[in-house]
Amino acid sequence: MAVLGTVDRQLQSGDSELAGQFQGILVSVDPDRDSLETLGAYATAFSPRFLGVTGSREDLVELTTQVNVAFAKVPLAEALTQEAPSPEALADAYTVDHTGNIVIINPRGHYHGFIKLPHDPETIRLTFQTLASQF
């Protein structure tokens, strides 16, 4: 999100019409931990125009499959090494691994592609400008 915030600021300082078309959206793949309020606060810390969203596990699987993003809930090793961990401890002892791609959705709302790591603000800005000029 930080790199998207940088791109947003670059666009805001340049072409205001183009800047108005740029939208950053953080999609959390951990709805058990990430509330909409938390996501909204996190996303707007990078730009007041950014959104934070999530959904049910089924909806997230459908979305991530469509946009070539992988994610998996991974148990933390320290919880598994406890002699008799409680069910609560096991339920909360995980991380979520996920692809670090930036997904590009075109102005018509269709999946356009993605940008792999490492994320360079200038590459993202140029990609966005090129895409915006086609619509």
Go through the PLM ranges and name each one.
Residues 34-37, 69-75, 104-107:
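Short, charged low-complexity intrinsically disordered segments located at boundaries
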Residues 1-63:
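Structural microenvironment flanking redox-active thiols in thiol-disulfide oxidoreductases
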Residues 25, 40-99:
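Short, internal strand/loop/helix patches
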Residues 77-135:
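Thiol-/selenol-based redox modules, centered on thioredoxin-like
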Residues 19, 39, 43, 68, ...:
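Generic intrinsically disordered, low-complexity segments enriched for polar/acidic and small residues
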